[in-house]
Design a protein with these regions (language model features):
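Bacterial extracytoplasmic/cell-wall-associated proteins, especially those involved in peptidoglycan
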Residues: 23-160
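Sec-dependent signal peptide recognition
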Residues: 2-11
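N-terminal signal peptide c-region/cleavage motif recognized by signal peptidases
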Residues: 17-19
Length: 160
């Protein structure tokens, strides 16, 4: 009788762990945080790649910091992906097929994106000035904004 009771308890305990064994990642907050981080990382890296891929390392950092500044502003959405894919904000969105043609530029964009998502201020000037906008030097938009600086082929702006 004692043997039967012990065996029953062992079976019951074993069965209670089956859902975890079937899918160990279900409802795992650490896994979910990792998945969300990877999603935001890819959005940031794509934006850096398509907006500043040919720019210097500093130029890439500045573009990433603008995205971070927007995430921290009440004027814009609250996640990197929402900021990047917000309608009419970045010229590449909707105009590229997503193909990564330059592996080196992509790797550097990923590295800058990771830095942007894990460090507080990656580009001091853009961060301190709260720059929220930039454009290529090849265009001349009629913006009523305060010009902060030019880095490479981009001019950065903040609200007045």
């Amino acid at each position: 009788m004692k043997f039967l009771l012990i065996r029953t308890l062992v079976v019951m305990l074993s069965l209670s762990f089956l859902p975890l064994l079937a899918n160990p990642l279900t409802n795992n907050p650490i896994y979910e945080i990792g998945q969300e981080f990877n999603k935001q990382l890819l959005c940031m890296a794509k934006n850096i790649y398509y907006e500043a891929g040919m720019e210097s390392y500093e130029g890439k950092l500045a573009v990433a910091q603008v995205v971070n500044n927007r995430v921290n502003s009440h004027l814009f959405p609250k996640t990197v992906c929402e900021v990047v894919y917000q309608k009419d904000q970045f010229s590449w969105v909707g105009n590229v097929n997503g193909e990564i043609k330059n592996k080196y530029m992509w790797e550097e964009s990923l590295m800058v994106a990771r830095k942007a998502l894990t460090e507080t201020h990656i580009h001091d000037l853009i961060s301190k000035t709260k720059a929220l906008y930039f454009h290529a030097t090849s265009v001349n938009p009629d913006w009523n904004l305060k010009k902060i600086t030019q880095i490479g082929n981009h001019i950065f702006y903040a609200k007045k």
